[in-house]
Amino acid sequence: MATEDDDSFRILVATDTHLGYAEKHPERGNDSFQSFEEVLELAVEHNVDFILLGGDLFHENKPSRYCQVRCMDLLRKYTFGDRPVHFNILSDPAVNFPHTKQVNFLDPNLNVAIPVFSIHGNHDDPAGMGLLCALEMLSSAGLINYFGRVSDLNDIKISPVLMEKGNTKLALYGLSSIKDERLHRLFVENKVKMLRPKESLTEWFNLMTVHQNHAKRGPSNYLPESFLDPFLDLVIWGHEHDCIKEPRHSHQNFHVLQPGSSVATSLTPGEAEEKCAFLLQVNSHHQFKVDPLPLKTVRPFLFEEVFLSEYNIEDEVKRIKKTELTKEESTWELLMKAKALGEAKGKGRGRGRGSKASDAASQAQIKDNPVELFVEHRVRELLKGAKKLLTGHPR
C-alpha cells in the first residue's frame, strides 16, 4: 500500500488460537491464553478498527468453564471501552449475524471499543441440541460478532459484511469450517455462491476468511484456490498452522495470507515457524498492506529430523563422551534417579532388592546404549537453541 490515510481500515488478523489447548498441563496449560492475550494487546497497541479471527478460537468443541471464563475475561478487558468505533455497517446485520441480529458495537447496552469478527473452525464448530457452538455463547454475551455460518449445506450463499470508513469500502466474506470433501463437492456442483453489493462493484475491497485445508491432502480433501471467486482481493486462510508471513499472489488474481496458529498443538515442522499476528491496512485507493507482528509469548519450539543412517553412531558417541558426558551426569541418569526416588516414596518399605537391581540394570542399559546417548545429545543441543529464542517477555 502506498500511503495510509484517515479512511484506512486497520485490522488485526489472527487465526487458530486454540484456547484451552493442554490447559491441564502443569507447564503448558497457560500457553494458549498468554498468546491470545498478546494478540489482543497488539490490537490495542496498533489502534485497530477491528479484530478478524479465522477460526478455531477454542481447541475443544465443548471448552471447559475455565477456558470460557478466561476467554470472556480477556475479551472484556481488551475490546470494551469508551473509544469510538470509526466505521459503519451498511449491510443487514440480521443476515450477517443471524443469531443476534445485530453487530455488538451498535448495541446501546454495550461499550465496545474494538469489535471482534470471527468465523468458526473445525475444532469449535456447531454441535448438539440446536446446533450451537461456543462462539454463539460469546456472541450472545456481546463479546464477538460471529459470522460466516452456513445455514443450508445444500445451497451455500455467502453474504458479505459491508463496512464503510470514510471513502473506504470493505466487503468482508466469511466461510466457517465445513468438511472438506463436502465443500469440494458443493463447489463442483456450483452450489456455493458469493453475493456481491448491488451497486459500485469496483469500489469495494473484497476480503474473505476461510477455515479449510489449504494443502492438497487427497483428491477432494482440501479447498483449491481456483474454486474461489476471482473478484476477491485478499483471502485470510485459517486452519493451517504454518505461518507464511508474506501474502502470496494466486492464479485467481487475488492474494492469500496464511497467518498460522498462535500456539503449537502438534509435533510438525510447520509449528516450529515463528508465530505472528498481522496488521492489515486497506486504504481508499483499493490498496492493502500486511505487516507481520511476531508473538513474543509463544513457547520456543524446535523441530529436527535425524536419520541415523547418515551418522557413524559409534564415532559420534565417542566424541560426545569426551566433550559432554564426562562433565555432568546424563539426562537419562537423572531421570532414572528421579523415577527411583518417586517409586521409593510411593512404595516405601515394600520395595525389594529385585526392584533396585532392575533400576540399576536399566540405568546401565541406557548409559551404554549408543543410540540413546546420541539422541540425548541432539536433544541437549535443541534445548540450547530453544533458550536462544526466549524473548524476555514478562509472560
Indicate residue ranges for each PLM-predicted region.
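Short amphipathic alpha-helices and their capping/turn segments at secondary-structure boundaries
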Residues: 1-8, 35-45, 162-163
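His/Asp/Glu-rich metal-coordinating catalytic cores
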Residues: 2, 50, 62-266, 271-274, ...
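Non-catalytic terminal accessory segments
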Residues: 9, 89-92, 309-395
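Short, hydrophobic/glycine-enriched beta-strand segments
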Residues: 10-16
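Amphipathic alpha-helical interaction motifs in eukaryotic regulatory proteins
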Residues: 15, 37-40, 44, 72, ...
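Acidic/histidine-rich helix-loop elements
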Residues: 19-34
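Active-site metal-binding motif and surrounding structural segment of the metallo-beta-lactamase
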Residues: 39-59
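Binuclear metal-dependent phosphoesterase catalytic core
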Residues: 159-166, 258-334, 338-341
